[in-house]
Amino acid sequence: YRIEYNCNWIQVLDAIMDPVHTSFLHGQSSGIQFSKGFAEVGELEFFERGVQYLGCNTRRVDDYVWIRVNELILPNFTQAGSAFAADGTKTRYFGRSSFTRWVVPVDDNHCIALAWGNFGERGDPMEYNTKEGCERIESGEIMDRPWEERQKRPGDAEAVEGMGPITAHKGEHLMPTDYGIMIYRRRIRKLIKSLKEGKEPPQPQNKKGDTIKTNGQDTVLRVPKRNI
């Protein structure tokens, strides 16, 4: 499927490297768009591995610990965990991403997400393999809604487009939870500068034809709280 965004492509990439946004956008301000577990604000960790960037959010949901990993491989490959198959209430080992997508710039103010929905035992249920299902997985809400409804219950599309067609980073006030955004933006700037100097950007595989290992996923472990 494809989703067209009326904003710069970096704004869409920012969302994937801001794993805490799921707690506020998808679990609190707009109500429960996926599951109650998303509303929990977890412990964040970020990892930089070559041109791969991972944002890990570890939440406690009752007797379970839910580790969700968002993934960006530069310049534009993104994945996260599942949207509906994992809710932090049952054991799950390396459940795979609900979508695999390329975020492609059209111009400074527009971009397109070219995406594949992943359905089955390790992805989301087949019942979501519909146009509306893919939109809910991608943005938290279906996208063809009245303006008033989109303002009351915004999804990812409203969040990334709501900053305007192209944001000025100079006026931002980034927080510790935005560390993933900081490090990947810094790397993109360096790669652009190197490309202008004639240096080809690095590739995610060691040599042409190698399988690229990806890490977007959910793991849920039963770890009851200890009585202290």
Show which residues each predicted segment covers.
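C-terminal catalytic domain of Rieske-type non-heme iron oxygenases
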Residues: 1-228
